[in-house]
């Protein structure tokens, strides 16, 4: 079993004022990386601040929404961050879903998988022009770039080969990651069975098409956890995780996870969600489902439990906790990170 890297996920509700202190805390506790998400705040600004105080941490987006931004805009942001972090950036990209792209970003939604493939190829063409000064000539199915003058070219940097990781749930994105990416962000609503039967085989197929091997692409994910110092604390933490599992399971985008296990509750949960019956939804999540999706263990054995479950299935993990985790003493976190890494 290889060493697992452990990443700190910046609280998506936190503001920029907390970015440097959170990154410093992550470094102090022994984390390998500092990741941000694009939810209620922009994902790149915290990484800029973190790069100034934690030079040893890998920095990454998990994820930034690709389609509202031109590949040119994304290429420039990533270029500057790679330079600021001395090559420690992992650019994590996601498609989001149609409702958000159309109604929240006022964008257009079409062919998300093939469009993401084109997006990544465009990024790399732009980066090549930045680094070499070669004329920019990219003609893809969705994106076309043909103008780059010296005034707008940022010029070469020391770490131009920026790793790209994409997020996804279904087979297409897993296959695409295996073919053209350096990482794949596995959604936290997953199980070992789903990894073994869907994600990893599709990634292997993609890697083979490109003449690569599976180990060329890291699998990255947050892992839902339920923990505590005793059984009472663990039991108290289960309700919130059941509710979160129910929320994901009610969404058609994640139906493939349910189908892998033969869990026939998706339609019922979707109906309850439409009615706003959130409390009842959590009660439909069985103990079997809870333990398949989440790692349930006390503090002192949680790290080993994560390693036992995932082995070489995941190369980078973060903790997805719905408990009051920031109140736990730092020594607990330090030991957990060390135990998880192995």
Show the residue positions of the predicted features.
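Active-site-adjacent structural elements that line small-molecule/cofactor binding pockets in enzymes
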Residues: 1-342
């Amino acid at each position: 079993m290889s060493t697992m890297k452990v990443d700190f996920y910046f609280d998506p509700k936190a503001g920029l004022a907390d970015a440097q202190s959170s990154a410093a805390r992550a470094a102090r506790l022994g984390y390998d990386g500092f990741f941000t998400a694009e939810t209620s705040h922009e994902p790149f600004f915290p990484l800029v601040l973190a790069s100034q105080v934690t030079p040893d941490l890998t920095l990454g987006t998990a994820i930034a929404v690709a389609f509202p931004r031109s590949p040119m805009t994304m290429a420039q942001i990533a270029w500057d961050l790679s330079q600021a972090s001395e090559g420690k950036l992992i650019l994590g990209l996601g498609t989001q879903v149609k409702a958000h792209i159309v109604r929240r970003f006022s964008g257009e939604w079409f062919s998300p998988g093939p469009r993401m493939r084109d997006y990544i190829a465009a990024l790399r063409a732009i980066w090549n022009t930045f680094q070499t000064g070669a004329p920019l000539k990219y003609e893809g199915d969705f994106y076309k770039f043909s103008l780059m003058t010296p005034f707008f070219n940022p010029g070469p940097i020391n770490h131009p080969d920026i790793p790209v990781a994409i997020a996804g749930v279904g087979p297409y994105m897993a296959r695409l990651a295996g073919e053209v990416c350096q990482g794949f962000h596995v959604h936290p609503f997953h199980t070992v069975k789903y990894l073994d039967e869907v994600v990893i085989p599709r990634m292997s197929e993609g890697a083979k098409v490109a003449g690569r091997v599976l180990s060329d692409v890291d699998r990255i994910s947050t892992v839902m956890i339920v923990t505590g110092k005793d059984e009472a604390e663990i039991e108290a933490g289960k309700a919130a995780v059941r509710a979160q599992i129910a929320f994901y399971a009610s969404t058609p985008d994640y139906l493939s996870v349910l189908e892998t296990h033969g869990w026939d509750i998706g339609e019922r949960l979707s109906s309850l969600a439409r009615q706003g019956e959130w409390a009842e939804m959590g009660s439909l999540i069985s103990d079997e489902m809870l333990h398949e999706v989440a790692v349930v263990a006390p503090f002192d054995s949680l790290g080993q439990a994560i390693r036992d479950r995932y082995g070489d299935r995941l190369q980078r993990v973060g903790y997805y906790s719905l408990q009051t985790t920031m109140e736990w003493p730092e020594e607990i976190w330090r030991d957990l990170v060390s135990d998880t890494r192995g």
